[in-house]
């Protein structure tokens, strides 16, 4: 079976406003393109890129999902720090970079386009502090079935996409954990991915805060060139969804 990567990027007044990507079969390309084009509410430029995938790899099962509801974002981040501490991430190191993410992680104190990469010892090692690194080329093999399962459990398509990304991330042996908050001011749910589990924490950031992004915590001896290649170039389909709580 042939698989294709379909990527959409939309902008308004030269500012990125929406994006999405899927891996699909040749027969479903037109349907997927139509679905992606419904994502941006307003735009003056949209780019669709369709590319054949020559080497597709498979992950048997996604991370499990656990939802944690808390009173406020401070309590949510306390839980996040404890989860990170459990896998050997120093609390003060984690807190410093999480605080930075909540206030703007690029040199201009705005949002980065991709993720920060932080080693266990606290070094910040992504190649570009404006661009960061983006995880791409991952989807569910039976996306519509998994989407239906998640929606029945009151999750969203946003969760579906984030679960796919975090599953690919933690599939890499050098990625210890991931921390993520949205850059949308009215979306306060975030997650920590660690120990084969996607901990969905609500809320993880303060309402009306426009800052957001991702942090990938990695081992000290991580080969950064290889990691970039894995995250940005290697293509994966996830066969099944993990357990849901």
UniProtKB/Swiss-Prot annotation:
Its cofactor is Mg(2+). GO terms for biological process: biotin biosynthetic process. It catalyses: heptanedioate + ATP + CoA = 6-carboxyhexanoyl-CoA + AMP + diphosphate. Pathway: Metabolic intermediate metabolism; pimeloyl-CoA biosynthesis; pimeloyl-CoA from pimelate: step 1/1. Keywords: ATP-binding, Biotin biosynthesis, Ligase, Magnesium, Nucleotide-binding. The keyword ATP-binding applies. Pfam families: BioW. One of its GO terms (molecular function) is ATP binding. It is an enzyme of class 6 (ligase). Coiled coil: none annotated. Its EC number is 6.2.1.14. The keyword Nucleotidyltransferase does not apply. Catalyzes the transformation of pimelate into pimeloyl-CoA with concomitant hydrolysis of ATP to AMP. Homodimer. Belongs to the BioW family. This is 6-carboxyhexanoate--CoA ligase. It comes from Sulfurihydrogenibium sp. (strain YO3AOP1).
């Amino acid at each position: 079976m042939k698989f294709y990567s379909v990527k959409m990027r939309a902008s308004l007044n030269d500012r990125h406003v929406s994006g999405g990507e899927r891996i699909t079969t040749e027969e479903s390309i037109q349907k997927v393109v139509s679905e992606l084009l419904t994502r941006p509410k307003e735009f003056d430029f949209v780019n669709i890129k369709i590319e054949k995938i020559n080497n597709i790899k498979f992950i048997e099962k996604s991370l499990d999902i656990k939802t944690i509801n808390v009173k406020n974002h401070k309590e949510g981040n306390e839980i996040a720090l404890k989860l990170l501490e459990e896998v050997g991430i120093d609390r003060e190191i984690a807190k410093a970079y999480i605080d930075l993410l909540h206030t703007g992680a690029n040199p201009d104190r705005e949002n980065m386009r991709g993720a920060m990469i932080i080693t266990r010892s606290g070094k910040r090692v992504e190649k570009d502090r404006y661009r960061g690194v983006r995880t791409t080329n991952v989807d569910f093999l039976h996306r519509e079935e998994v989407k239906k399962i998640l929606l029945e459990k009151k999750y969203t398509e946003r969760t579906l996409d984030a679960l796919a990304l975090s599953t690919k991330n933690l599939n890499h042996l050098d990625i210890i954990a991931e921390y993520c908050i949205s850059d949308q001011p009215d979306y306060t749910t975030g997650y920590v991915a660690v120990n084969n589990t996607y901990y969905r924490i609500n809320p993880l950031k303060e309402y009306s805060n426009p800052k957001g992004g991702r942090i990938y915590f990695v081992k000290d001896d991580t080969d950064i060139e290889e990691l970039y290649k894995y995250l940005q170039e290697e293509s994966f389909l996830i066969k099944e969804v993990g357990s849901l709580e």
